[in-house]
Amino acid sequence: MTSQPSLPADDFDIYHVLAECTDYYDTLPVKEADGNQPHFQGVTGLWNLGNTCCVNAISQCLCSILPLVEYFLTGKYITALQKFLLPSDCSEVATAFAYLMTDMWLGDSDCVSPEIFWSALGNLYPAFTKKMQQDAQEFLICVLNELHEALKKYHYSRRRSYEKGSTQRCCRKWITTETSIITQLFEEQLNYSIVCLKCEKCTYKNEVFTVFSLPIPSKYECSLRDCLQCFFQQDALTWNNEIHCSFCETKQETAVRASISKAPKIIIFHLKRFDIQGTTKRKLRTDIHYPLTNLDLTPYICSIFRKYPKYNLCAVVNHFGDLDGGHYTAFCKNSVTQA
């Protein structure tokens, strides 16, 4: 899902990018394919190389995200890769991904092969090269992690902090952060408030991630909002789930509540349909309803960071089958054709 406000299709200068790369200046970049059928750039199929539907579905969704496409088509990734003195596995993944995006947006074919990209990632994760069903969420996380590792830059900043003592003393510390096109687009941060139910002292913990996994609260039917409310409701951790309290200096029952302290430009939801409990595994077939536009995350934003984010749907990965086998497909909104 992409954040609003909803802007024209050329927000990320994609028409200018396509024009520079292909020398076409039509209102919509269209090529005549075989059979006199129009071929829209960015609307390109991927060959199934033998149970690679997971790879193809994720690639199609990433291909529909304009700022990511613009970053690779304009060659900005090359500058980021130049920090490597020697070729690395993650730089090969980034280069292969760039070639795939180029084929899908600037190529003449109705269908192209993802083999180079698939092989580059398979060198790092051999499990993905096996002729068996893979998990789309795991594949997506691996792709985003490798792209981030290849393209990241280091930023150094000085932040003010206070040391406890008889008198509080202000000091400045250097903070190192890593940023990339991946963190700029997809990174989200959750803030957990953890309250000890004995001393009632509160501590905070932050968690950063790119894929937001949501529980499914109903067996039959629910909405995406129901999934969000289930995730953000306050949880009581008791018995074997007690957390160590630094004030009581022992494990105590606690109340934990999460809120969003950094909302991403593009949010990725993973619906936890695969349920494994002990030796029992199953797929939840709950019907989940979600809005196409104006998904409002305001109720879940940390109050001091409130920015009223709203999101429009841009792509969905579907899975047909069960845990042992099935097929992945993708529905994507093309940012150029708006279809």
UniProtKB/Swiss-Prot annotation:
CDD domains reported in the protein's UniProt record: Peptidase_C19R
Record's subcellular location: Cytoplasm; Cytoplasm, Cytoskeleton, Microtubule organizing center, Centrosome; Nucleus
UniProt enzyme class: hydrolase
Recorded GO MF terms: cysteine-type deubiquitinase activity; ubiquitin-like protein peptidase activity
Pfam families, per the entry: UCH
InterPro entries, A to Z: Papain-like_cys_pep_sf, Peptidase_C19_UCH, Ub_carboxyl-term_hydrolase, USP_CS, USP_dom
Catalytic activity: Thiol-dependent hydrolysis of ester, thioester, amide, peptide and isopeptide bonds formed by the C-terminal Gly of ubiquitin (a 76-residue protein attached to proteins as an intracellular targeting signal)
One cellular component (GO) term of this entry: postsynaptic density
Residues of the active site: 53, 327
EC code(s) of this entry: 3.4.19.12
Keywords per UniProt: Cell cycle, Cytoplasm, Cytoskeleton, Hydrolase, Nucleus
Tissue specificity field: Weakly expressed in a few tissues.
Function: Deubiquitinating enzyme that removes conjugated ubiquitin from specific proteins to regulate different cellular processes. Regulates the inflammasome signaling pathway by deubiquitinating 'Lys-63'-linked polyubiquitination of the PYCARD/ASC adapter protein. Regulates the ubiquitination and stability of the ACE2 protein. Acts as a negative regulator of the G2/M checkpoint pathway, by preventing serine/threonine kinase WEE1 degradation, thereby repressing entry into mitosis following activation of the G2/M DNA damage checkpoint.
PANTHER family, alphabetized: INACTIVE UBIQUITIN CARBOXYL-TERMINAL HYDROLASE 50 (PTHR21646:SF11), UBIQUITIN CARBOXYL-TERMINAL HYDROLASE (PTHR21646)
Protein name, per record: Ubiquitin carboxyl-terminal hydrolase 50
